Amino acid sequence: MIQMQTRLNVADNSGAKEVMCVKVLGGSKRRVASIGDVIVVSIKEALPNAKVKKGDVAKAVVVRTVAKLRRPDGSYIRFDDNSAVLINASKEPIGTRIFGPVARELRAKSFVKIVSLAPEVL
């Protein structure tokens, strides 16, 4: 569960290392985001030669959460960290590589490019 002020790792090579959730998109009273949800983030830590700079505001999709996610078959999946991938206005990833595993639920939410770039889909 990702809410406002939550800090997340960045799982791509856009140059950002850490981001902070500023807003959860999808309704005026929406408080928490889970895997596959789009959030507005502020870049808190970035590499010097990055595509994004510290202080920039961008959109990101959550790819891993520590909170358990229940699947339709009754199983649960959880990860060791909260991570997101920065995306542009057309929901394509800004980076060209994805680091670490991502959840299968991203494919159903039409983030096929992120799933295809990921080294492992759980």
Swiss-Prot record:
<comment type="subunit">
    <text>Part of the 50S ribosomal subunit. Forms a cluster with proteins L3 and L19. In the 70S ribosome, L14 and L19 interact and together make contacts with the 16S rRNA in bridges B5 and B8.</text>
</comment>
<protein>
    <recommendedName>
        <fullName>Large ribosomal subunit protein uL14</fullName>
    </recommendedName>
</protein>
<dbReference type="InterPro" id="IPR000218">
    <property type="entry name" value="Ribosomal_uL14"/>
</dbReference>
<keyword id="KW-0694">RNA-binding</keyword>
<dbReference type="Pfam" id="PF00238">
    <property type="entry name" value="Ribosomal_L14"/>
</dbReference>
<keyword id="KW-0699">rRNA-binding</keyword>
<keyword id="KW-0687">Ribonucleoprotein</keyword>
<dbReference type="InterPro" id="IPR005745">
    <property type="entry name" value="Ribosomal_uL14_bac-type"/>
</dbReference>
<dbReference type="GO" id="GO:0003735">
    <property type="term" value="F:structural constituent of ribosome"/>
</dbReference>
<dbReference type="GO" id="GO:0022625">
    <property type="term" value="C:cytosolic large ribosomal subunit"/>
</dbReference>
<dbReference type="InterPro" id="IPR036853">
    <property type="entry name" value="Ribosomal_uL14_sf"/>
</dbReference>
<comment type="similarity">
    <text>Belongs to the universal ribosomal protein uL14 family.</text>
</comment>
<dbReference type="GO" id="GO:0070180">
    <property type="term" value="F:large ribosomal subunit rRNA binding"/>
</dbReference>
<dbReference type="GO" id="GO:0006412">
    <property type="term" value="P:translation"/>
</dbReference>
<dbReference type="InterPro" id="IPR019972">
    <property type="entry name" value="Ribosomal_uL14_CS"/>
</dbReference>
<keyword id="KW-0689">Ribosomal protein</keyword>
<comment type="function">
    <text>Binds to 23S rRNA. Forms part of two intersubunit bridges in the 70S ribosome.</text>
</comment>
